[in-house]
Each structure stands twice: as structure tokens, then as C-alpha cells.
């Protein structure tokens, strides 16, 4: 009996051991087949990181100019990542650092840049058979150098951001943020110098590493009235509908009074006129009448609460929920807890300008493998339909009226149809407000958002579009 018992125990042990080996085998096989890309692209993977720094990483191109490229090095690693016009293009390229990983396109398109993407399997195979060292693919971006120059120059001496989109495709034409930083400081193989630069950048009170264009969110102020206007047009209002516009509006169930920057022109005005002069009381009352759910749904259709499924690293913009009527009134004019990135507000303008269809924004037009063959090209993708064509056409005309007759006059361009909306957003009583301008033009087909942080400019000039509108105009002009 002891012998049979021992045999039974040994049999159970052997089966258990076999099952353990089988489970291990399945796990390893699963990781190799299905998680290889995730593991390879995790910047904490030191083995892969060391290998990456010893290979020729692909270029990031703006036109024919490599704004990020890899050069041979005699240092610790075989190749050094370098950036041309680093500060200007940092919000697009991001950085590629041994200690601090990757950001922006360097991160989102890492498989393409390292040559490990599925699209480059044939290039890898032919390279291996030919005895060539691994080499990454190059990205041809959608960025227009002239538009980027105009955006960058427009932000000189200011804190803020500019985003320009081709609203018919979603292509990012410009993405600038100031103050910025030089990615070369973090890409250097002098690892001690890289650490020192990192600390210095983090300690800088101007926060130059913040990508204000897509990775930071701010109160959108009166530019959010475009979302409220869109919701109204989608729910039975017309540009000529009369809306209540008192000089002051006591927020529901409070003693707090909301006022206007200027006289709205009467107790009742058309929806178009309310947008032209950015009437706070009209849009606050309008939002309360529409309901929280209606505004939240409209904001969601423009992209609030989600991120595009693309190569852009984007913070999630937000429209608050569970609001009382006073909070809803403030949210309807882009205050309270509403927050959006400049990219998000450019998407709002783009959805309106493209007859109600919002295209997914993207930065990479195509990928070229090491053998110079194009192995991947972007396919334009509708992201949502925030408005009907009819409502979008109506809001376009209202925005054109803002530029021709209202607060957006500084964006006017002779011979070009330009629609826009100015905005101010109060952050605290002791600081000047943020300045915004959101707009679009018909030729070229571009939607633009300009954001400028607190400045010493008079509030009346901010509300009048003196800061943002001229920058938007210059970006549009650069694309003509």
C-alpha cells in the first residue's frame, strides 16, 4: 500500500510540474506574440532602451526638414538624437531621453521610429537578409513650416499656445507652445548634464516643459459659447431667435450677479447679436434653459471627455456634471469647472467649419521605411458629427458676423471669409484673465485656436481680441 501511495503522490507531483511548465510556456508565448510591442515600447524596459540607443532611429520631418534625427556618435551609445529648432517643435516631436523616456511623437510613434512596427516587417526582413543593422522608419508630419513659424513668432514674449488644423482632414498644420524647452538638453548622452537640465526645467516657474497646446487644459471662457450656441441651434433655435439678455443676471438660488463686458443692446437680442458681442447673461440663461444634459452631450460630440485615437498626446478636456443651475449658467459661458486644451477648442472650430463633421486630428501623414518605401499612410477619419449641416452653416454665418461686426474684428483678412469667437476666462480676482481666440477661414481650410495666459493687457483689449485674433490671422495668412 505504501508503494502504491508513493506512486500516486509522484504521479500528482509530476502532473503538477507539467502543468506549471505548460502555464509558463503559454505565458511566455503570449508575451512574445501579443505583448511584444507593449513591452518593447515601455520606456522603463532598460534592455530595450539600451538597444534603442544603439540603433539608427528614424527622422521626424516637417516638409523636407528633419526636425528630429539621429546622427552617428562616438559616445556611450552608437547614435545621438538631435533636434533642429528644438523649442519651436518640442510640442510636436517631444523628447527622447535615456533617463526620462519619450513624449509626443517620439512616444506615440515609437514603433515606427524604431522600425519595430507591423508596417515595417518586410523592411526588417530584407534588412536582416542583407546583413544591415536595424534602422527605424521616418515620419512625414502634417505640419506646415510657415504656419508653425507664424504661430511661434506670434507667441514671442507671451505664455500660451496656438493650434491650427486643416478642418477638412484633421491634419495638424501648426502646434506651438511658449515658453518651451530644447529637447537636445534631455537627449544628450552626457547623462549627468541631462539630469541637471531636467531639474532646472522642472524648477523653472514658467513651466517650459508644459505642452500648453495639447497637454494642458484651461477655462475656455467665452469661446465655449460656440458649444452653447451649437446646442441651441440643434434644439430649435435659429440665428434670429430672440434670447433674453439683461444687463445683470442673478444666478439661480444665489445672490451672485453675472454681468456683461459691454451693453448687450437690450433686454432681448438675436442669438447672432449675442454671439457678436459675447453677451454673458444671454448665454448663461440660454444654457440653463437648454439643460445640463443637452450641453454635456454637445460638448461630448465636440470631443470633451475623450481623446482622439491618433498619434497626438492630448489631455482630456472636461465639462462638469451634477450641476446646480448657478453652476450650469457659469459653465454655459466656459467658466466654473469647464476646462479645455487649445487643441480641443481648435477641434470645436473645425467641427463647425467642416459643416458639422469633426475629423480626427493627427500629426503623421505617412511613414517611410529604411529602404525609402512608404509603408504606411494616414486615412482621414471622421471622429463625430457634432451638428447637422444646416446648423453648422448657421453657426458659420454667426461666427463670420463676430469677425465682421463684433469682437473678432482683428482677425479680418481681405478677400478671405473668416469666422471666429473671442474669449476671456477669469482664473482668480488678483490675476488678469486668460485670452482666447477660436476661428476658421474658408481659403485656406484651417481652424485655429490661440490661447494666451495672464498678461498685462487691459481686460477690455483681451475681450476685444487684441491678443489672440492677430496671431490667428497671421497663421491663416501664412497658409495662403
Regions found by a protein language model. Give the residues of each.
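Hydrophobic membrane-insertion alpha-helices, especially the h-region
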Residues: 14-29
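Beta-lactam-recognizing serine transpeptidase/beta-lactamase-like catalytic domain environment
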Residues: 172-222, 227-454, 464
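Single conserved hydrophobic/aromatic residue that forms the stacking wall/gate
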Residues: 1-8, 12
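Short, small/polar residue-rich loop motifs at catalytic or cofactor-binding pockets
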Residues: 52-56, 156-160, 361
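A conserved hydrophobic secondary-structure block that centers on an alpha-helix together
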Residues: 128-171
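Beta-lactamase-like hydrolase cores
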Residues: 45-49, 144-162, 179-189, 297-298
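Short, gly/Ser/Thr-rich active-site loops of penicillin-recognizing serine hydrolases
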Residues: 374-379, 468-480
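Small/polar-residue-rich segments within soluble enzyme cores
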Residues: 33-34, 41-42, 48-136, 153, ...
Amino acid at each position: 500500500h505504501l508503494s502504491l501511495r508513493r506512486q500516486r503522490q509522484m504521479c500528482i507531483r509530476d502532473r503538477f510540474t507539467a502543468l506549471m511548465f505548460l502555464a509558463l510556456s503559454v505565458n511566455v508565448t503570449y508575451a512574445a506574440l501579443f505583448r511584444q510591442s507593449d513591452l518593447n515600447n515601455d520606456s522603463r524596459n532598460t534592455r530595450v532602451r539600451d538597444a534603442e540607443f544603439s540603433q539608427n532611429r528614424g527622422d521626424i520631418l516637417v516638409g523636407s526638414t528633419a526636425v528630429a534625427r539621429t546622427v552617428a556618435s562616438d559616445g556611450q551609445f552608437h547614435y545621438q538624437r538631435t533636434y533642429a529648432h528644438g523649442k519651436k517643435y518640442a510640442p510636436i516631436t517631444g523628447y527622447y531621453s535615456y533617463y526620462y523616456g519619450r513624449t509626443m511623437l517620439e512616444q506615440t510613434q515609437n514603433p515606427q521610429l524604431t522600425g519595430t512596427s507591423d508596417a515595417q516587417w518586410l523592411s526588417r526582413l530584407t534588412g536582416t537578409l542583407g546583413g544591415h543593422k536595424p534602422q527605424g522608419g521616418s515620419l512625414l508630419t502634417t505640419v506646415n513650416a510657415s504656419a508653425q513659424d507664424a504661430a511661434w513668432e506670434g507667441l514671442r514674449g507671451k505664455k500660451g499656445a496656438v493650434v491650427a488644423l486643416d478642418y477638412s482632414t484633421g491634419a495638424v498644420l501648426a502646434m506651438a507652445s511658449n515658453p518651451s524647452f530644447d529637447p537636445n538638453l534631455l537627449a544628450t548622452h552626457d547623462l549627468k548634464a541631462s539630469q541637471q537640465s531636467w531639474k532646472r526645467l522642472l524648477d523653472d516657474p514658467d513651466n517650459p516643459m508644459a505642452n500648453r497646446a495639447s497637454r494642458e487644459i484651461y477655462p475656455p471662457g467665452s469661446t465655449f459659447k460656440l458649444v452653447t450656441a451649437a446646442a441651441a441651434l440643434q434644439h430649435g433655435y435659429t440665428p434670429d431667435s430672440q434670447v433674453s439678455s439683461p444687463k445683470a443676471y442673478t444666478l439661480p438660488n444665489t445672490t451672485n450677479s453675472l454681468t456683461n463686458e459691454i451693453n448687450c443692446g437690450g433686454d432681448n437680442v438675436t442669438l447672432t447679436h449675442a454671439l457678436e458681442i459675447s453677451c454673458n447673461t444671454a448665454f448663461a440663461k440660454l444654457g440653463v434653459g437648454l439643460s445640463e444634459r443637452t450641453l454635456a452631450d454637445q460638448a461630448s460630440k465636440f470631443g470633451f471627455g475623450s481623446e482622439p485615437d491618433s498619434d497626438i498626446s492630448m489631455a482630456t478636456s472636461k465639462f462638469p456634471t451634477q450641476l446646480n443651475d448657478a453652476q450650469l449658467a457659469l459653465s454655459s459661458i466656459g467658466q466654473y469647472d469647464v476646462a479645455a486644451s487649445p487643441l480641443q477648442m481648435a477641434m470645436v472650430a473645425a467641427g463647425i467649419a467642416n459643416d458639422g463633421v469633426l475629423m480626427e486630428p493627427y500629426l503623421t501623414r505617412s511613414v517611410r521605411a529604411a529602404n525609402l518605401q512608404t509603408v504606411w499612410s494616414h486615412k482621414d477619419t471622421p471622429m463625430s458629427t457634432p451638428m447637422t449641416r444646416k446648423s453648422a452653416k448657421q453657426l458659420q454665418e454667426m461666427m463670420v458676423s463676430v469677425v465682421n461686426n463684433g469682437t473678432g474684428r482683428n482677425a479680418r483678412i481681405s478677400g478671405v471669409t473668416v469666422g471666429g469667437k473671442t474669449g476671456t476666462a477669469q482664473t482668480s480676482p488678483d490675476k488678469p484673465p486668460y485670452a482666447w481666440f477660436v476661428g476658421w477661414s474658408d481659403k485656406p481650410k484651417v481652424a485655429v485656436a490661440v490661447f494666451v495666459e495672464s498678461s498685462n493687457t487691459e481686460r477690455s483689449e483681451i475681450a476685444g481680441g487684441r491678443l489672440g485674433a492677430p496671431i490667428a490671422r497671421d497663421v491663416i495668412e501664412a497658409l495662403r
